[in-house]
UniProtKB/Swiss-Prot annotation:
Interacts (via LIM domains) with TRAF6. Found in a complex with TRAF6, PRKCZ and SQSTM1. Interacts (via LIM domains) SNAI2/SLUG (via SNAG domain) and SCRT1 (via SNAG domain). Interacts with SQSTM1 and RB1. Found in a complex composed of LIMD1, VHL, EGLN1/PHD2, ELOB and CUL2. Interacts with EIF4E, AGO1, AGO2, DCP2, DDX6, LATS1, LATS2, EGLN1/PHD2, EGLN2/PHD1 and EGLN3/PHD3. Interacts (via LIM zinc-binding 2) with isoform 1 and isoform 3 of VHL. Interacts (via LIM domains) with SNAI1 (via SNAG domain). InterPro entries: Ajuba-like (IPR047172), Ajuba-like_LIM1 (IPR047245), Ajuba-like_LIM2 (IPR047247), Ajuba-like_LIM3 (IPR047248), Znf_LIM (IPR001781). Keywords: Cell junction, Cytoplasm, LIM domain, Metal-binding, Nucleus, Phosphoprotein, Repeat, Repressor, RNA-mediated gene silencing, Transcription, Transcription regulation, Tumor suppressor, Zinc. This is LIM domain-containing protein 1. Expressed in normal and breast cancer tissues (at protein level). Ubiquitous. Residues 186-260 are annotated as: Interaction with EGLN1/PHD2. GO terms for cellular component: adherens junction; cytoplasm; cytosol; focal adhesion; nucleoplasm; nucleus; P-body; plasma membrane. The lineage of its organism: Eukaryota, Metazoa, Chordata, Craniata, Vertebrata.
Amino acid sequence: MDKYDDLGLEASKFIEDLNMYEASKDGLFRVDKGAGNNPEFEETRRVFATKMAKIHLQQQQQQLLQEETLPRGSRGPVNGGGRLGPQARWEVVGSKLTVDGAAKPPLAASTGAPGAVTTLAAGQPPYPPQEQRSRPYLHGTRHGSQDCGSRESLATSEMSAFHQPGPCEDPSCLTHGDYYDNLSLASPKWGDKPGVSPSIGLSVGSGWPSSPGSDPPLPKPCGDHPLNHRQLSLSSSRSSEGSLGGQNSGIGGRSSEKPTGLWSTASSQRVSPGLPSPNLENGAPAVGPVQPRTPSVSAPLALSCPRQGGLPRSNSGLGGEVSGVMSKPNVDPQPWFQDGPKSYLSSSAPSSSPAGLDGSQQGAVPGLGPKPGCTDLGTGPKLSPTSLVHPVMSTLPELSCKEGPLGWSSDGSLGSVLLDSPSSPRVRLPCQPLVPGPELRPSAAELKLEALTQRLEREMDAHPKADYFGACVKCSKGVFGAGQACQAMGNLYHDTCFTCAACSRKLRGKAFYFVNGKVFCEEDFLYSGFQQSADRCFLCGHLIMDMILQALGKSYHPGCFRCVICNECLDGVPFTVDSENKIYCVRDYHKVLAPKCAACGLPILPPEGSDETIRVVSMDRDYHVECYHCEDCGLELNDEDGHRCYPLEDHLFCHSCHVKRLEKRPSSTALHQHHF
């Protein structure tokens, strides 16, 4: 990783190489990797690198101050642990501080019984946020001397600085989240805690020995200060001075109440009972009130290093750790809060040594999750740089591992200090008050969705039910208000729905043409070729470009639909046609085609105000009713008795007149009389 000069790129590369979880495919800052030279991303990287350089310098100054101010000797008893003699304790902790650059042979990874008890600290103050961020993420099998603050571990760190990360095969290995948790237990209040050994303060800057399978730290010359320049926790929005002051004040307030305790030695799970340092969960620091915790230890613990600054840990080969014991915990569900900048790294959940955690915590807990190499892998929070600022509850499954590490004895060798415990301890973890960082701007999709939602709400509020006209026949949505209602061809439309099928212009209040189920404006209908599908007049044969009149299944121009006799327009007037499809008005039709009376020779027309024609048919002739009478006496003839018709030589007579006419004639003609 020496080819990267920019710390931002170094951190991004390191995140991708972590085998604890899958790195974000969009990169560290929620930016598409294929986007190229994004000016916003370049500016963010520049600011990030500048802040990290400042944190390096402040960290060195604080470490030098810690080495000068913290005494080496006064240590309190371990909470719940056994006591050793002063000579043994100085061999464990004090002797490691006198060695300068001496490299000890690596120790084999320890294995522990599954029934071991977890050592929990009672009041160990944590590191400030700057120190916690300066600690590197370590996972994989660790080998090396148990050095708490000396420069012994730098030799091993420099040798393994360029090794690629490998899978964690040892259950006692640390995840980067565990490393943060342990770090929060070792920061004393500067100048106010004489009982804390320099080994605790120096554990921040010391190079932790790592095997070739561990994550690569940055190399540093042996002559330099033990503080390694490995800023891999991304915390660009945090002010180092403010965070340090807040942490120190919180530690000083509790220094008189609780003695300094041990770290929790549950393999890769480190729990801080004192004031917490910022934990990084799901890409965001958890924010909440700071509360002290009082962990309950299930059984007395036999520890090889009873000093308060001993910092017992169960991992073999981690600098600054002494003896520790293991236990199997049942991890209760913990609240996981997401807040602050999205560039933080989520802590991987520990799984090798279980520890019972109280589920009713009032703050956020350090990252807990599955760890490679364990038998039972649980699911834990992943890296989530794009997560929103909302609290999220994450239920952690019960994590277990087959093996637990042995504790370290005072002479640096493995000691069998495992104890059985009938129950798992429970620890309350506090909230971490952090300064929230800059929010990421919402994406374009989120902005569009918000705009659509607001538009729908405004439309629902703006249209009362009283203005509802009905449903649009085109979009099937309700039509509210006269301003958007449009009625055409007996149907209801939105004015935005009733548009030209060719140019999509609104047709409300304009001339339109309905052709084959579509409506067109006049311009598109006349000049775009749509007139080829228009109807033609049955009489003149021309295209009907204006109003159309349909009659008898045929289409006509209104001006062409006229009576052939009087030439009057028959639009809206009763009409009829003859066998030759000639159009007549009713009056002219009867005049031309009505039957004529055989008596008077006039056409038999229907009476005024009626369409029915009344006529009398006699001797295959048509007569008006008033023309059907006796020619001699004028008697009206009909079918009644005494009024019957007796024709004679095509003349109409009643019976008496008919007899008279016959008497005047010769008798020969009487044989040919007819009665009608």
